[in-house]
Every structure is written in structure tokens, then in C-alpha cells.
């Protein structure tokens, strides 16, 4: 039995795509990590068109800023590896992220290596072996549902290989990763309530409500992990942390 709803709120790309396929009329408020224009969710940020609007936690140059912060946290970084899923629901997520990190690494004169895993049967052991062979001494993960699901395993392998790891979501740091720099998911969903209010109480149409990008980002650091891999976090970075896990 299908329930009639007045508005849908969705926080993952697979769910947003499923909702979009299911209805062209029910308003959908998204909270996503991808570029909603590049992935075809909306027509534009200013005029979404259709029945979808909301927020994206992805902003211009965010990955470059993330790498700069990572380099400040790990001054000895000379070769960064980017771990990504080749079969994400939105196929462009991995390649776009990898391209942005590679460009930032080139600008900073840091070596770069792409570390791909299959979404259906991810071989993380193989990816870390490739990283070791390529002399990678710092790791970044591209956030997807599959990599989130294996956050603990990725963190354990990074610690085992004494690799500092930067993540695009704090759930990886809570699972044992070293650091994350990203928009707060809690703030994003609180802001999503604004869209729901405009749609339900003010009669606004999703097509006319601009998609927002975040203005505040959270830096989360796991000091326990830093100690396990023998890394001393610079005071200048630690002081700016929004949350520290001990």
C-alpha cells in the first residue's frame, strides 16, 4: 500500500534518485554530497526546476581546501592516495573527486595516486598494497555509501599501515579515521526543515527555491588514531577543531 505524503526528505543519492523516479509531483527536499546539476537532479542552483530542491554539502574548491588542510596537519605528506569506488550509484562522484584532488596535489607539488575499489566487492587490502607500493604516505577517501559502510575496515587498514587519513564525513573519524573536514550533516538537515516549512506552510514550489550550499564546515580529529600512527597534530590545527575524539 502506497502512502500519500506531502513532502519527501532524503539524505542519500540512491534514495534521492529513487524518489525522483517514483514521483514527478511530490516535493522532494534533498541533502546531498554531490553536485546536483552535474548529476541531473536539478536544472540549476538558482532555478532547480522539477520537484527537487534542498542542499548540497559540496562547494567549489572544497576538495582543494581539504587537501591544503591535510597537508598542514601532516607536514611530511609527499604522496597522497585517493581511495574511491568505481561503481557508485552516481558514476561521476568518484572521477570528479579524483580529478579535483589530483589537480590540487599537482598545484601543491604533492605526488598523487588513484586507488580504485569495486563497489560490489571492494578489495581494500589490494588498494592499500598498491598504496604501499606507490609510496603513498597519506590517504583521502571519496565519500560514497559503500565506503561509508566499510568505514571501520578502512580506518583499521589505515592505522595498520600507519597512514594518516582524511575523510569527507565525520562518520569515518568516529570509526577510527584520523580527520574529516565537511559540512555538518546535523546543520544541513536542520536547514532542510526550512525548505519543508516553505513548501508546506507557504505553498512554495521546489522549482522556485534555490539549492543552497554550506557556509560552515566542521573539522573533526581523532587523537587516539593520531597516537596509534605516531602523528603529532600541530597545535595550529588542533586549536581550530570543532570536535576532538580522544
Stretch-by-stretch model annotation:
Residues 1-246:
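Short hydrophobic alpha-helices and adjacent helix-cap/hinge residues
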Amino acid at each position: 500500500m502506497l502512502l500519500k505524503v506531502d513532502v519527501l526528505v532524503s539524505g542519500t543519492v540512491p534514495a534521492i534518485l529513487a524518489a525522483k523516479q517514483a514521483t514527478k509531483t511530490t516535493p522532494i527536499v534533498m541533502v546531498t554530497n554531490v553536485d546536483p546539476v552535474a548529476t541531473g537532479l536539478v536544472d540549476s542552483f538558482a532555478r532547480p526546476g522539477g520537484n527537487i530542491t534542498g542542499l548540497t554539502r559540496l562547494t567549489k574548491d572544497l576538495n582543494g581546501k581539504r587537501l591544503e588542510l591535510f597537508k598542514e596537519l601532516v607536514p611530511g605528506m609527499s604522496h597522497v592516495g585517493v581511495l574511491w569506488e568505481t561503481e557508485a550509484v552516481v558514476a561521476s562522484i568518484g572521477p570528479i573527486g579524483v580529478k579535483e584532488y589530483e589537480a590540487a596535489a599537482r598545484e601543491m607539488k604533492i605526488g598523487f595516486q588513484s586507488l580504485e575499489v569495486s563497489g560490489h566487492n571492494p578489495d581494500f587490502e589490494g588498494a592499500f598494497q598498491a598504496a604501499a607500493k606507490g609510496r603513498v604516505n597519506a590517504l583521502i577517501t571519496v565519500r560514497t555509501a559503500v565506503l561509508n559502510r566499510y568505514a571501520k575496515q578502512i580506518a583499521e587498514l589505515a592505522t595498520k599501515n600507519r597512514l594518516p587519513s582524511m575523510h569527507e564525513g565525520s562518520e569515518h573519524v568516529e570509526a577510527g579515521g584520523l580527520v574529516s573536514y565537511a559540512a555538518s550533516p546535523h546543520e544541513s538537515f536542520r536547514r532542510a526543515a526550512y525548505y519543508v516549512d516553505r513548501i508546506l506552510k507557504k505553498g512554495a514550489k521546489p522549482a522556485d527555491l534555490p539549492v543552497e550550499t554550506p557556509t560552515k564546515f566542521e573539522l573533526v580529529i581523532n587523537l587516539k588514531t593520531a597516537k596509534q600512527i605516531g602523528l603529532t597534530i600541530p597545535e595550529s590545527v588542533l586549536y581550530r577543531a570543532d570536535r576532538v575524539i580522544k
